[in-house]
Amino acid sequence: MEKEPKDKGDQYLIYTDILAIFKLASDIQWKEVRQNSVYRILYLSSVLYSFRHPEKSNPFSIYKFTVDTTGPYDSNISKAFDFLIKDEYIKRTTGDDVFAIGKNSSNDVFKIEIGQERYEWLKQVMYILGIYGENKIYDFIFRDPQYQTTIKSNTQQGLNTDINNETIKTLKNFQEAFEETLKDQKEKLSPQTYLELYFEYIFSKILKRED
């Protein structure tokens, strides 16, 4: 069973995370975003955070994702969508699952209220995904190590997004293997660069139709 947010502050963060995604989507020329894509973007933001910021607690741990037929799911995100639609922060466009920024959204809520650091992390994730397009997000999710581990376990447990999740372990192994080839140059690469290289690697598997 999924947990409710601990307090209204957590629910407010969910609202602003969603609105930030729509703002960032507009910045990368995605005029519309599917609701399922928002679940997937927030899952990737959660599961990858501790690789990029291992010294910090994960601010996206407010999300409690389970595996649904369409990918990661959190009922609190669904409830947030209902609220944001009702108050016209977002609006339906070409279908029941497709949305765009509504008439009540303003730039202030996207960056100031969400917090600069949280916003910048969402921006990094969105800009990486923007290279490949919204239609490829599910392919990245399907090949996500933690997502695959949870599916194969065939249990009702949620998706683990803490610092010991399978995705972080895979990224660390990827980094170590890459550093072996770099030798003395390894200090020149940042965690963000490794993250981008990892997405390139996964995308190559998508093109080859490999798991």
Where do the protein language model's features map onto the residues?
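Domain-edge interaction signal
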Residues: 1-211
